[in-house]
């Protein structure tokens, strides 16, 4: 199985459903014998540029380990979910478990 880093932006009006969305994606990954190594909720942040006339979005970061089929299903779910404005998936060489720079910045 390969390691991936996923960042997705959720519509600010759907912020209440973020935890349910994340749990659904986590269950989908774990059902396929995958693992979630890191999950960070960065909260509502200002976008660098407007997306669909919105200036804020709810950011989520996940570092996961899964097979290609599960990743394809996740990406399909991201595309067909109207609440997700953007998503980015990057393949990593190894699992990343330490806190990201965004979370370290929040703690200070």
From Swiss-Prot:
Any one GO MF annotation of this record: small ribosomal subunit rRNA binding
Q: Which UniProt keywords apply?
A: Ribonucleoprotein, Ribosomal protein, RNA-binding, rRNA-binding
**Which cysteine pairs are joined by S-S bonds?**
none
Q: Extract the CDD domains matched here.
A: bS6
The cross-references to Pfam families, in alphabetical order and at most eight, read: Ribosomal_S6 (PF01250)
Q: Provide a GO CC annotation, any one.
A: cytosolic small ribosomal subunit
User: Which stretch is the leader sequence?
Assistant: none
Q: Name one GO biological process term.
A: translation
InterPro entries linked: Ribosomal_bS6 (IPR000529), Ribosomal_bS6_sf (IPR035980), Ribosomal_S6_plastid/chlpt (IPR020814), Transl_elong_EF1B/ribsomal_bS6 (IPR014717)
UniProt record similarity statement: Belongs to the bacterial ribosomal protein bS6 family.
**Job description of the protein:** Binds together with bS18 to 16S ribosomal RNA.
- Xref: HAMAP family: Ribosomal_bS6 (MF_00360)
> What's the protein here called?
Small ribosomal subunit protein bS6
Classification from the root reads: Bacteria, Pseudomonadati, Pseudomonadota, Gammaproteobacteria, Cardiobacteriales
